[in-house]
């Protein structure tokens, strides 16, 4: 656990130096929440165990979610293009971001999260990863109604809806 904490501290320091400017800041507290949240998710392929994020994965996820404007505290990035080679986890990263936003953004009520991709098969695979993250975590599962046949997930407490 200490190694993980030291690693996280080093990553946070590096990203804070990179993003802290007069106009933007790197929200370290939210980055810690993201790290903790992801560490509670389990892999949907291979051995079903909790994730150990790699540095590049943490950097991509938190640069999208944790870089904010100083003026109003809103995220700098409203859209993101993840450009990494095939079979390096783009869908995995997208699923983490979607699940984090679906569950951890308290000010979002009745939102519609739509998963899209180049093909229906890719969108279905992304949905399958999101669904696995939720079903494998009893805390997340408790807050949702999952309808696999229509590929729809509805939050019971705030009415947010995720669908393909």
Briefly describe each language-model feature range.
Residues 1-164:
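Phosphate/NTP-binding elements of NTP-utilizing enzymes
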